[in-house]
Amino acid sequence: MPYSSLHPSIPQPRGLRAQVAALVLLGACLVALWGLGELPEYTLRWLVLHLASQQIGLLVKGLCSLAEELCHVHSRYQSSYWRAARACLGCPIRCGALLLLSCYFYFSIRDKAGLPLPWMLALLGLSQALNILLGLQHLAPAEVSAICEKRNFNVAHGLAWSYYIGYLRLILPGLRARIQAYNQRHKNVLGGIGNHRLHILFPLDCGVPDDLSVADPNIRFLHELPQQSADRAGIKGRVYTNSIYELLENGQPAGVCVLGYATPLQTLFAMSQDGRAGFSREDRLEQAKLFCRTLEDILADAPEAQNNCRLIVYQEPTEGGSFSLSQEILRHLRQEEREVTMGSAETSVVPTSSTLSQEPELLISGMEQPLPLRSDIF
């Protein structure tokens, strides 16, 4: 399933454009240095000195961070000082190698530059102290967002996995059996194409009313599917249920489907309304989009979700625009009908004249008894 197929506003994963821009910058700087006419040895000397200063400065910054982490070594690092040091300074082998190389080039080039050692060390300490106290090297919001997405630190990532493991993975495997049981008692109400799926509504503004008729009066509650129960987290016979809704168009019934909102969106909305969460409306919109994308990725690889659910992602227009939720759902239902019809047309095999003109062949197996026609007996 391609990215942003559900809604055009859902962002794609970040690529390598920052590295490409850095490569272009590298080429431009090399051309500029070549145009200035400086000797390569002179440029290399100061470049190595600058890189060595950066590495020593990062070591000083890590030591300052270690002073704080040592106060939490028992609660955060299971009483392991080694883990606390690695969290602040990184891999010891890499850190030691960079430190040795940096010190070697730093002290050898410093002598040629004629700069006193105490002055340069004091300058390094001063610069790092100002960076920490004044926050001069804070990450940009885009960098923080990229790190959180890459390391799966987002609120949306946890909500998507919780929704899948705690709900969808439990109800989707038995959904078709429950729909069949419902159809037997209600004259095949859900017998249409696409009606065997769970349709999950995803409003990107996270506005999730408890009653769907409040969102659109053309959505009318019809029945409940047969309940499903399971022992879950110490709760015996926990009940899971799904609702069936009838969709009206021009006052007449136009469709029936199993429908419901993605409940974690209520959590995102409540967080944006509670000042203690520190969650702005912009954060809510970003996390809602990432939640939808993450859930889409999860369901794409989940065998129990294949053809059993459909995500309906929409964003209501601002004031002055017209939007009908019932029409959006009907559009998806009709699209499902077209997809199923086209799929069945492609899979149907029409025998060609050359095939029909061949002489019939008898395929005789070496087994003494004929095999049954049903393969699921084995």
UniProtKB/Swiss-Prot annotation:
<dbReference type="Pfam" id="PF23417">
    <property type="entry name" value="STING_TM"/>
</dbReference>
<feature type="transmembrane region" description="Helical; Name=4">
    <location>
        <begin position="117"/>
        <end position="134"/>
    </location>
</feature>
<dbReference type="InterPro" id="IPR038623">
    <property type="entry name" value="STING_C_sf"/>
</dbReference>
<dbReference type="GO" id="GO:0035438">
    <property type="term" value="F:cyclic-di-GMP binding"/>
</dbReference>
<feature type="transmembrane region" description="Helical; Name=3">
    <location>
        <begin position="92"/>
        <end position="106"/>
    </location>
</feature>
<dbReference type="GO" id="GO:0045087">
    <property type="term" value="P:innate immune response"/>
</dbReference>
<dbReference type="GO" id="GO:0002218">
    <property type="term" value="P:activation of innate immune response"/>
</dbReference>
<feature type="binding site">
    <location>
        <position position="167"/>
    </location>
    <ligand>
        <name>2',3'-cGAMP</name>
    </ligand>
</feature>
<dbReference type="GO" id="GO:0000421">
    <property type="term" value="C:autophagosome membrane"/>
</dbReference>
<dbReference type="InterPro" id="IPR055432">
    <property type="entry name" value="STING_LBD"/>
</dbReference>
<feature type="modified residue" description="Phosphoserine; by TBK1">
    <location>
        <position position="365"/>
    </location>
</feature>
<feature type="modified residue" description="Phosphoserine; by TBK1">
    <location>
        <position position="357"/>
    </location>
</feature>
<feature type="binding site">
    <location>
        <position position="162"/>
    </location>
    <ligand>
        <name>3',3'-c-di-GMP</name>
    </ligand>
</feature>
<comment type="similarity">
    <text>Belongs to the STING family.</text>
</comment>
<feature type="binding site">
    <location>
        <position position="263"/>
    </location>
    <ligand>
        <name>2',3'-cUAMP</name>
    </ligand>
</feature>
<feature type="binding site">
    <location>
        <position position="167"/>
    </location>
    <ligand>
        <name>3',3'-c-di-GMP</name>
    </ligand>
</feature>
<dbReference type="GO" id="GO:0000139">
    <property type="term" value="C:Golgi membrane"/>
</dbReference>
<keyword id="KW-0449">Lipoprotein</keyword>
<dbReference type="InterPro" id="IPR029158">
    <property type="entry name" value="STING"/>
</dbReference>
<feature type="binding site">
    <location>
        <begin position="238"/>
        <end position="241"/>
    </location>
    <ligand>
        <name>3',3'-c-di-GMP</name>
    </ligand>
</feature>
<keyword id="KW-1017">Isopeptide bond</keyword>
<feature type="short sequence motif" description="pLxIS motif">
    <location>
        <begin position="362"/>
        <end position="365"/>
    </location>
</feature>
<keyword id="KW-0391">Immunity</keyword>
<keyword id="KW-0399">Innate immunity</keyword>
<feature type="lipid moiety-binding region" description="S-palmitoyl cysteine">
    <location>
        <position position="88"/>
    </location>
</feature>
<keyword id="KW-0072">Autophagy</keyword>
<feature type="binding site">
    <location>
        <position position="238"/>
    </location>
    <ligand>
        <name>2',3'-cUAMP</name>
    </ligand>
</feature>
<keyword id="KW-0968">Cytoplasmic vesicle</keyword>
<feature type="modified residue" description="Phosphoserine">
    <location>
        <position position="354"/>
    </location>
</feature>
<dbReference type="GO" id="GO:0005776">
    <property type="term" value="C:autophagosome"/>
</dbReference>
<feature type="topological domain" description="Cytoplasmic">
    <location>
        <begin position="70"/>
        <end position="91"/>
    </location>
</feature>
<keyword id="KW-1133">Transmembrane helix</keyword>
<dbReference type="GO" id="GO:0061507">
    <property type="term" value="F:2',3'-cyclic GMP-AMP binding"/>
</dbReference>
<dbReference type="Pfam" id="PF15009">
    <property type="entry name" value="STING_LBD"/>
</dbReference>
<keyword id="KW-0333">Golgi apparatus</keyword>
<dbReference type="GO" id="GO:0032481">
    <property type="term" value="P:positive regulation of type I interferon production"/>
</dbReference>
<feature type="transmembrane region" description="Helical; Name=1">
    <location>
        <begin position="18"/>
        <end position="34"/>
    </location>
</feature>
<dbReference type="InterPro" id="IPR047191">
    <property type="entry name" value="STING_C_chordates"/>
</dbReference>
<feature type="lipid moiety-binding region" description="S-palmitoyl cysteine">
    <location>
        <position position="91"/>
    </location>
</feature>
<keyword id="KW-0407">Ion channel</keyword>
<keyword id="KW-0945">Host-virus interaction</keyword>
<comment type="subunit">
    <text>Homodimer; forms a homodimer in absence of cyclic nucleotide (c-di-GMP or cGAMP); 'Lys-63'-linked ubiquitination at Lys-150 is required for homodimerization. Homotetramer; in presence of cyclic nucleotide (c-di-GMP or cGAMP), forms tetramers and higher-order oligomers through side-by-side packing. Interacts (when phosphorylated) with IRF3; following activation and phosphorylation on the pLxIS motif by TBK1, recruits IRF3. Interacts with DDX58/RIG-I, MAVS and SSR2. Interacts with RNF5 and TRIM56. Interacts with TBK1; when homodimer, leading to subsequent production of IFN-beta.</text>
</comment>
